[in-house]
């Protein structure tokens, strides 16, 4: 299996990310890129996925998006990307991170496997329950 290379996205990646990131506006995408809040995964120089994050309550790093192309899933890249993100934040002095997943998404099992604990949830607009996960760096 080819090795995943992870790098911090920059504003130079705007055109690339615009082709894939459809959950946020172009303006927010530019802000995320300029604030170094997107990690880009590549294999042999080919884009395969990304992780986007923000801050919950302006304090706790919160992973908003982890996505890999369909044909790149199941190769351990998601685990490697999340571990890279966690280690980056630990080195910056953070003691915990958060994320979420709808109760009907497979991602909830992925996060539990990585040591995340469900700490609550909420429902919006009749969507399935959104489960909030936390991982502490003890």
Language-model regions, residue ranges each:
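Acetyl-CoA-dependent GNAT
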Residues: 2-64, 69
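Short acidic/glycine-enriched loop/turn segments that link adjacent beta-strands
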Residues: 35, 59, 104-105, 125-129
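Active-site beta-strand termini and strand-to-loop segments that position acidic
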Residues: 42-44, 134-137
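A short, internal acetyl-CoA/4′-phosphopantetheine-binding micro-motif in the GNAT/acyltransferase core
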Residues: 66-73, 102
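Conserved acetyl-CoA pyrophosphate-binding loop and the N-cap/start of the following alpha-helix
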Residues: 72, 76-84
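Conserved GNAT acetyl-CoA-binding A-motif
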Residues: 89-102
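Conserved catalytic-core motifs of GNAT/GCN5-like acyltransferases
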Residues: 98-100, 112, 117-132
